[in-house]
Amino acid sequence: MFAPVYLDHNATTPVDPAVLAAMLPWLQGQYGNPSSRHEYGRAARRAIDEARQQVAAAVGAHPTEVVFTSGGSEANNLFIKGAAACLKPGLLGVSAVEHPCIVKPAEQLVKQGWTLAKIAVDGNGCIDVASWKKCLSGQPKLLSVMRANNETGVLHDVAALAETALPTGAWFHTDAVQALGKLPIDFREWNRSGVHVLTISAHKIGGPKGAAAAILDKRVELSPLIAGGGH
């Protein structure tokens, strides 16, 4: 009898044993609220701060630029909806091959007065130059192009694209969920080129589901998706 072979690691990965071992204490005896001032809470806060430093180091960012979320979809929605809420409606450009958690919230913004441009790709799945230039000519306020496509594996040079978008003043986001752990990510370097936000998720690289992050340039103003809990 044959056992199934798992070949869908682009969708999700099993939790690495080392990751599970690191998590177990916080699923058992360590249960403090990191906002609490007693020792249980302080221990949890120290663990979160350490995790924040580790994530920042993995993507070449400063720990203060790391915002934890419950998943890549939430992180992407945080940028699209959160940034749009702080701006007057205008042009929003996303590549035509973005993940649905970018495309769907972008389409929802049309009902709020935004204009959506879906940037075409060529026969190789790369950003079509003419379509990109047309979008930039419309002075977009928000742009999103993924670093690595989850279905085709096509890589987009987001730093180069962001640099061409600098004159528009748009906030540039890249979904780097599929790139994490497979390609070098240097947020500081990308940020100098004009990438303002990138999003990543743990479950693609042997981490748990429900753990992700948005890496944010501090100049980007976002409205929170969830109100309360600011303590």
Where do the model's predicted regions map?
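Pyridoxal 5′-phosphate
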Residues: 1-231
